[in-house]
Amino acid sequence: MENIQKLIARYPLVEDLVALKETTWFNPGTTSLAQGLPYVGLTEQDVNAAHDRLARFAPYLAKAFPQTAAAGGMIESDVVAIPAMQKRLEKEYGQTIDGEMLLKKDSHLAISGSIKARGGIYEVLTHAEKLALEAGLLTTDDDYSVLLSPEFKQFFSQHSIAVGSTGNLGLSIGIMSACIGFKVTVHMSADARAWKKAKLRSHGVTVVEYEDDYGVAVEQGRKAAQSDPNCFFIDDENSRTLFLGYAVAGQRLKAQFAQQGRVVDASHPLFVYLPCGVGGGPGGVAFGLKLAFGDNVHCFFAEPTHSPCMLLGVYTGLHDAISVQDIGIDNLTAADGLAVGRASGFVGRAMERLLDGLYTLDDQTMYDMLGWLAQEEGIRLEPSALAGMAGPQRICAATEYQQRHGFSQTQLGNATHLVWATGGGMVPEDEMEQYLAKGR
């Protein structure tokens, strides 16, 4: 306890985290993209290479998953205005939200119904391509739909993939790996929803369940993979490949905005609110957004009050050297996708200069907003996907933050607030009814 007191003396906000209070932290260390980019260790070229790889796989995906055929084998989500929800939030919180609120529906992405369809599927495809190229079975000029042939399935069945997950990452990696022909094992933490485990098993995926949290599931997955030279472990805490799979979203969103005639520039700022677990998904997306929109996009991460691992790590500068359990927080939350006690050190260090801030919200707040969104817009999400929804009113109320960045009333009036909905499109009906019943 003495150590916690010392920590609080140096970092006063820790007291609110320990008390499980909804907390907002505006990052005093935010820099321009030009200053912050070198610390990421990845470049625009890396993201472009990921774009190109996904384009090579498009013919394969269009055939393997017919639901992607209309989009030409591209796994991408809609971005929609949510004016009724914006009004409801203003009414419930008594706070005007300047500008326009939009929802990015990664909750309804093809194949696995969450943001993890970006990174997880991309890393599996990257590994499959690498193996096939090295074996001389494929060239990058081939039509990749050849990967659907029995010969390739046979080849991939000699290899296996392992991952540790609270649910959604396991879902995307499991479904994709099984489709390609890999043997796949998903190590699931105690938070993982039963329906996610059942869905994986229905695809022939081996699910190993733990009574412990996410960190233990990842560690056990890593250990199990080390003993098998043909097993590839997808490391959610450190993977650059996953990160790049998420980063592709930036250019794609820019194209969607261009189609909609939506302007993002110095006088029309873009604020983006991303739910954060270990950090790979929001970190990669935020990196891609920064490359696409430069200093005109402002990214915020959102975490449950019971799992504020990234806020704790970035705010104290301790990154993965501290966990929420170290300050007496239990890491138990209804937002199963965000139930992570120790953040990715890679993501925290890469992105700490490119984030405008982080905030926490209570499980009940997520349930409330889940209900309001269903009532007002007819859109149903899982609890973690609502974490971003609390962002706009926090930003609009934060006059000190607005002054620090020199936002005028006109700029705020022209702003776009994009809430990144991370999952929920595949939640079974009975489970969704339980979620809706918990809202006020």
Swiss-Prot record:
It holds the Pfam family PALP. InterPro entries: D_Ser_am_lyase, Ser/Thr_Dehydratase, Ser/Thr_deHydtase_PyrdxlP-BS, TrpB-like_PALP, TrpB-like_PALP_sf. The keyword Endoplasmic reticulum does not apply. The keyword Lyase applies. The modification N6-(pyridoxal phosphate)lysine is found at K116. Keywords: Lyase, Pyridoxal phosphate. GO terms for biological process: D-serine catabolic process; isoleucine biosynthetic process. It comes from the Bacteria. GO terms for molecular function: D-serine ammonia-lyase activity; hydro-lyase activity; pyridoxal phosphate binding. It catalyses: D-serine = pyruvate + NH4(+). Its EC number is 4.3.1.18. Its cofactor is pyridoxal 5'-phosphate. Belongs to the serine/threonine dehydratase family. DsdA subfamily. Monomer. HAMAP family: D_Ser_dehydrat. This is D-serine dehydratase. It comes from Salmonella paratyphi A (strain AKU_12601). The gene is dsdA.
